[in-house]
Amino acid sequence: MFFSNIDKSKYNIYIHYKYDERLEFLEEYKVSKNIPTKYADISIVKAQNFMLLEALKDKNNTHFIFLSGSCIPLKPFEYIYNNLEERYSYFHIANPEDCLPDCINALTYIDMKYLNKASQWCILNRKHSELLVNNTEYLIWFKNSYAADELCYITYLSYTYGDNLHEEIKATSYNSPPEVATTFANWEGMDYKYATDRELKNYIHITQAELLHLLKSPCFLGRKFKPIAAQSINKDFYLDYVVKNVKGKLFY
């Protein structure tokens, strides 16, 4: 539904699957090879890299948005498409000290000043995607690190651009409300009006008030939403705005 009536020249979809089971609606978008992955393991980065390699074959692809199967859109396609700037990648960044002790071994290869941690659910531009698939030293740096998917890309960009990193990326902070990130997630202890008290919230239901709040917030996407949550998401105001992109729709 999200891509209904959208010009197909404006997007491509690439799906890396954990299990090779037929997808009812998206089977044609599965990538040609499966990279076996484990939770919080460097193998996830290898799978992401393979998707990037596939996506880079299309010269018209300017940005690469990583999503999980539990993501939902919180803005219309055209809004997201028009608000991505070609020169930037987008990251939701943690405090650098949060890298330790998970990536202590990386200090064998690089200086502490380059270490960074960010949400896996970043948006890479073409320039940075090409850099990351053509220079994969970070796979060695973080091969034994927990949650390497949160370390590799942002650290390598920090290592490459140094003090000029801020000119290459648009970053939001873990210390900010989570709805300012490009992909929202509700973690325990965050500065959020509807904060969970149980680590990462897996939504089986969302109140209308919270859904409206997220639609009005800067975030493009949100996670983690279980399939059953669709019952509380598929409301007219959500579908009119996010799917139909009704101009001037008043849901505020």
Regions found by a protein language model. Name each.
Residues 1-252:
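ER/Golgi luminal nucleotide-sugar-dependent glycosyltransferases, focusing on the catalytic module
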